[in-house]
Amino acid sequence: MGSSKRQFKAMLRKNWLLKTRHPFVTSAEILLPTIVMLLLIAVRTRVDTTIHPAHSNIDKDTVVEVGKGNSPSFPEVLKLLLAEGDFLAFAPDTDETNNMIDILSLKFPELRLVTKIFKDDIELETYITSAHYGVCSEVRNCSNPKIKGAVVFHEQGPHLFDYSIRLNHTWAFAGFPNVKSIMDTNGPYINDLEMGINTIPTMQYSFSGFLTLQQVVDSFIIFASQQNNDLPLSHSNLSSALRFELPWTLFSPSVIRMVPFPTREYTDDEFQSIVKSVMGLLYLLGFLFPISRLISYSVFEKEQKIREGLYMMGLKDEIFHLSWFITYALQFALCSGIITACTMGSLFKYSDKTLVFTYFFLFGLSAIMLSFMISTFFTRAKTAVAVGTLTFLGAFFPYYTVNDESVSMVLKVVASLLSPTAFALGSINFADYERAHVGLRWSNIWRASSGVSFFVCLLMMLLDSILYCALGLYLDKVLPRENGVRYPWNFIFSKYFGRKKNNLQNRIPGFETDMFPADIEVNQGEPFDPVFESISLEMRQQELDGRCIQVRNLHKVYASRRGNCCAVNSLQLTLYENQILSLLGHNGAGKSTTISMLVGLLPPTSGDALILGNSIITNMDEIRKELGVCPQHDILFPELTVREHLEMFAVLKGVEEGSLKSTVVDMAEEVGLSDKINTLVRALSGGMKRKLSLGIALIGNSKVIILDEPTSGMDPYSMRLTWQLIKKIKKGRIILLTTHSMDEAEELGDRIGIMANGSLKCCGSSIFLKHHYGVGYTLTLVKTSPTVSVAAHIVHRHIPSATCVSEVGNEISFKLPLASLPCFENMFREIESCMKNSVDRSKISEIEDSDYPGIQSYGISVTTLEEVFLRVAGCNLDIEDKQEDIFVSPDTKSSLVCIGSNQKSSMQPKLLASCNDGAGVIITSVAKAFRLIVAAVWTLIGFISIQCCGCSIISRSMFWRHCKALFIKRARSACRDRKTVAFQFIIPAVFLLFGLLFLQLKPHPDQKSITLTTAYFNPLLSGKGGGGPIPFDLSVPIAKEVAQYIEGGWIQPLRNTSYKFPNPKEALADAIDAAGPTLGPTLLSMSEFLMSSFDQSYQSRYGSILMDGQHPDGSLGYTVLHNGTCQHAGPIYINVMHAAILRLATGNKNMTIQTRNHPLPPTKTQRIQRHDLDAFSAAIIVNIAFSFIPASFAVPIVKEREVKAKHQQLISGVSVLSYWLSTYVWDFISFLFPSTFAIILFYAFGLEQFIGIGRFLPTVLMLLEYGLAIASSTYCLTFFFTEHSMAQNVILMVHFFSGLILMVISFVMGLIPATASANSYLKNFFRLSPGFCFSDGLASLALLRQGMKDKSSHGVFEWNVTGASICYLGLESIFYFLVTLGLELMPVQKVMSFSIGEWWQNLKAFKQGAGSSSTEPLLKDSTGAISTDMEDDIDVQEERDRVISGLSDNTMLYLQNLRKVYPGDKHHGPKVAVQSLTFSVQAGECFGFLGTNGAGKTTTLSMLSGEETPTSGTAFIFGKDIVASPKAIRQHIGYCPQFDALFEYLTVKEHLELYARIKGVVDHRIDNVVTEKLVEFDLLKHSHKPSFTLSGGNKRKLSVAIAMIGDPPIVILDEPSTGMDPVAKRFMWDVISRLSTRSGKTAVILTTHSMNEAQALCTRIGIMVGGRLRCIGSPQHLKTRYGNHLELEVKPNEVSNVELENFCQIIQQWLFNVPTQPRSLLGDLEVCIGVSDSITPDTASASEISLSPEMVQRIAKFLGNEQRVSTLVPPLPEEDVRFDDQLSEQLFRDGGIPLPIFAEWWLTKEKFSALDSFIQSSFPGATFKSCNGLSIKYQLPFGEGGLSLADAFGHLERNRNRLGIAEYSISQSTLETIFNHFAANS
């Protein structure tokens, strides 16, 4: 094997070539993420940014004074509580609390009327959340009042006063602005990225009354503390104080104002804030396509077994994965670079460009690893792409749950284990930092803006990559797989492999035993004991030298649900060098399992095999250095050239770099592909691909070649060329060949082994097996006319044991036993005499004796290898069926279980509907409208049916029968197809369920308690001033006193500054207007100081103080300027001031006030009503879920067209309209299930946006219309696909993008005023997509509820809400369905090139009945001039004259000058596929249609079946023209296509029932007709199995049965036995023979590549070459006319032990005759046997003597034939490798040959020489054909003036004993020889 580095480079080059050969797809992978970015950039450029100059922010709207204006005073609060009947709560229920209420009640008497005291905070919360909260009568003194707010004390002195102000979520007062929510205490405490001013927190604090309560409580604390500085105010001293006037106002903060900080100049970018919530999703959608492609690549190579093929050739597992990782890492690096370059000036203008690149690149790496991990679960690319893409998208959903500031950091990190979630969280950081014009940089990635820092997001994506990689590698080893070794789950932690190897080695039997020991176990009950031909001494020597493959007791057992199944049972087999072993066996015999174990794809259960001395268990790496495999299915890349394939595999096999090019060129030349070396594989024919696979197996000088059905699918001529190639390369190699072709096995196999039930039943040469198992010869005689009675007594007189096997038409066949060989000569002479007399008598016209034995011709054929196979392997005809039952994948088994249950229960869908009385009128109106629409559609259907079907469908019951049958077909298939069920029901349901669940699980915790303190400011500071600087105006005396007691920061004195705001006069005027002429200028001065001193401290400032002078009543007033980056800054600095005032008032510096903001918990009613579900996200989830449904609509449609099942239905009589209408109805009904589930989920999750009052009807209408519109639009898209897997993936992506991305883009554009008008215009085009209409309608409903729609849109049916979507969807349902019918009439690739007139002509043709999809190329009359100048054969001309003259008008079928020409292109001219074809087919005739691939057979059948339209000429079926009346002739035709056109999920019985209905079998006879066919084709035991579980043979049986259902008079069979093993093939032949020749009622047209099949079935055969009919006639007629030789195979008697011993003794005597030997020879002899005086010719063993080259030459001279040994040195012709080569190779490798081996070779050569001399003298003109060391083959001249059969048998039989002939056989030229003759001359 090649080095790891070279293998890695080869894999990278392969990946690179695969990418570059698909430039569009690769470009899309790279650019689609960029396109999403460009769309955002385009929107971004339309959004204008606003530049805000520096501003003081002092105006009427921003200056707030507590208790004035919109901020309610405490008396106003109490009055409002009284008016609404609500209460203000206090806790705990202590004396201090009651005293406070008593004192405050003196000043505010209404307080006692609205006060409710609770024992403690817990009792308060329990009451608030209880079910009876707020439930009371309208009587004022109700027991369960609503609580609007509460004051809860935690400490009540003497030094610390700690309390919480708790407000209700619905706190709002009539007459004040509607504050939708109270302060958010769960949000970030500080947001340094906030730009400008954010007045919302200030308004919330002031409007809600929080500051009012804070002022009242703090004033009371200051007042009460002044009464007793040491003790808290008690009830005792309070009672005495009540008699005096209390100093209420002393140090009381009576005037409190709040003003925001000034702001510097900034640019407001609303774009980032708008797209922030959807940015992560949009980015992710851009990566979906490259992710789907990566999953597809990973699984495709596994699905197509390419990966295992690479492993077989020596590729290391880790290199395979690493190559794909590097490939996509480079691709994502390029993509990330492009994204960075495109966004550096727009989306990420302020961020570090390297950080942007790192962000996208790390996500790309994690996506690669996630895709790899996902791919390990799948073996089918189609399923993997669909589910993998969904999984990838689903990994984003936790983002909706954790994207909340209240979610803990730990939960966000855990969610970030899903890389899409980590990616989306990172996008939030980008949006926040970009909006702040700061940008993300390496210096600030530690600071979080979304609760999790950008650094953590990057780190998690990197960690995810490593985690996914580890999991993927582990799962790839342990998950079940179709090929390769599956590791145990704990292989990482155990020494499993070491123990396994040792255990297996201990069980391996000794390899020194004979190949087939005498005590070999034979299964009980087998009809035959194993039979093996003996081997030569040279072969035994190979076993001793380790130059062969030795399989010993190889055993493989599979575990299944039904128990263990033995696939290979103690296999014993040896393969030798320079030989080809053909391994035969029925399907499931164990051949493929054996090969899989030999190449290392499967581990053996027990036993072992040594390949060139290396164990397959312990030394597989060494074996693969010499191993070349040509698998059954080509492991080729269509996008690579021949050279690139050979180069890649040469590197894997270790070919040196210096010789790589020459090795590749030589191998291409050796396999006959030198002229195609730079051709892409997809442009190669099937035969060329097999040659390339063969070259791949041979390259690197592979010594062991395994060929698994190397010629499958080839025509006979290409097959012969491949056989010659395989013969050519077998020298010096060990070749194992498996095949179903007996001719191939016989032609190539030096030895043939037959397996059955996992064991080897026999092994030997072809002639050995034939004579051991053969039944003799087949004699075929052709009578002069059908009425002539052939004298069978001629045959029986000579051979009484002869049996008649068939008599059809003019031919009769006899089976002659082998024992009758001596009688053949006399019998043939009498037959030839009768032939001569028949010719003489035919000249006398008046003699008409029907009893005269007139024989026109005769032929003889020997027992075929196929008959041997049938005797050995065909004894148990059910073996294939048993294997089908046993070897079923787990997926299949589960499917079968489901099918069983489906058959027991019928589908009974129920339509449930409900409505309330209020909507009754609306529903009634809609129902009437719906009935009108149905009537209109029905009328339209009637019109279309008249146009398409020729008459009204209402009067045609057959139309409805077809619709019903097709509907049942779709229903059954869909219900059993787990993928369809998953796509249509499970995936949408699960996706919708979990998506809504994630949104519902989005945390909505109770608002937490926060302490209003400066401790959170500047956390890096330490010491007393931990809160940072507090700018303080000390110009007022009281200010200096208060400043001394300030804590929570250090005082920064106000200084004069020269800074002025822009427009200073305007700023001053605003300040005076807002705060008055005294305070206004002072506030402006403070703001100017804040601006000028911005950079004087590295610590942030969050508040500053301006104090008024002390008021006359002793009260104080002050103004707090607060920083907008902290939403709690205002009340925090109020608390700082009040605590300082308390200390000043009491003179106690240890006293303080601590205020907390802790909103009350939501009430039970509020919790039910508060579904803070993001409506827009809900619409996205619904749209994504429903995007999978149209993909499920497309799959069965494209798949039916792909396997030609659709065409099979159309030619069986189905009309286009019935096909599409039944499909449409089923798809709509199936759509109702996920739609109903969606409605149920809407109710379950309380989505009032969709099912609330007035919203249910539009939601249901949109769902139903969406089902109709999306189905019909999907039908239109299906015409653009030829592969269902590609259709599923692309259509899924189309609906993803058209429905989701367009909706998101439209949503974003609609929110931005600058793009709103453009959005309204674009929506008219976007709505052409049903997905957009549906998602936009749902989003509009949801956004209407959120108040985000236009104010003009009040009703749900408004045009801009759901009206447009409902109208568009309804129209699209009809429009797209009509387009579908139009596309059916005109293929998509021709729509653009067709003019209206041509389309109309095609429509007229369709009206006349050409109801299938036309695939006819448009060709002008100029093609009529294309012709070929070739004279017709005389038989062909006679047939043509007979048809043209009208003599065949009464026949069932005749073709008349049928011609088909395909148009050319700019590179190639027109191609004539069929040229003037003329012949007829009679009733009871089986016409064989033979020809090479591309000869025109399938095209001819396509024209007869209506799939193609002739260019010129026509054909007549029962006198009806196939061009003029295509529909009329279909009822007479049964068609079996070349490839099974089956529905994989329908059972065998259901297939037959479907086509019985289609073909018009009456209902009451369908069961009988179907049962008859099941019995006739031996399918009764499979009747309830779905077709995908059938073997290839049973599938072909079903296809033929479908063609014969309804007993059509004409049956067309296109290669009906392809892929069958001989047992199944013989059964099929018998069925077809009964149909045609035996019943005499049906005409059969048969195409085949098997000449044996044509010989067995066809009464007449026509051979097509180049589109023309070259010959026609019965099989025997063709063989008699074109056959010019006999095939002779002779095997001499084996060399006996006596002969061998005597010959060795002669040579020993001569060798030890020392005086006569030269000294050099004596030296060699001493070396060979050692020097010992005791050694004599009598005591020396022959096996101890090794002959050197000189000794061999001397011995040959002594024996008198020195020339014979010269063949040991020079090579023989390349086309044949004889015994000489093996000895020659051993002689030069080992320096000598053992004497017994040389003796055996010499004696064998003597026998061959004698035979050759006899044959050359007895049969002049005989030519040598081949020799395999065991037998020789000759071609003998035969025919006019040549040898007769009687002469041939007579010569051989008379000289048989004299020449020592063990076995011989003579046969005539085969049909294959004649076929190859015509093919070679084409």
Swiss-Prot record:
Provide the coiled-coil residue spans: none
- Entries under PROSITE patterns matching the protein: ABC_TRANSPORTER_1 (PS00211), ABC_TRANSPORTER_2 (PS50893)
Under CDD domains, the record lists: ABC_subfamily_A
Residues engaged in binding ATP: 585-592, 1491-1498
Listed InterPro entries: AAA+_ATPase, ABC2_TM, ABC_transporter-like_ATP-bd, ABC_transporter-like_CS, ABCA, P-loop_NTPase, R2_ABCA1-4-like
Residue stretches making up the ABC transporter domain: 549-782, 1453-1691
Recorded hits in Gene3D superfamilies, A to Z, give: P-loop containing nucleotide triphosphate hydrolases
Answer whether the UniProt record assigns the keyword Repeat to this protein.
Answer: yes
Q: Which subcellular locations apply to this protein? A: Membrane
An example molecular function term from Gene Ontology annotations: ATP hydrolysis activity
The source's superkingdom equals Eukaryota
* Classification via Pfam families: ABC2_membrane_3 (PF12698), ABC_tran (PF00005), R1_ABCA1 (PF23321)
Query: What cellular-component terms does GO give this entry?
Result: membrane; plant-type vacuole
Write down the membrane topology: Multi-pass membrane protein
Q: Where are the transmembrane segments?
A: 23-43, 271-291, 319-339, 354-374, 383-403, 408-428, 454-474, 933-953, 981-1001, 1178-1198, 1225-1245, 1250-1270, 1290-1310, 1366-1386
Q: Which family does it belong to?
A: Belongs to the ABC transporter superfamily. ABCA family. CPR flippase (TC 3.A.1.211) subfamily.
What protein am I looking at?
ABC transporter A family member 1
Q: Which organism is it from?
A: Arabidopsis thaliana
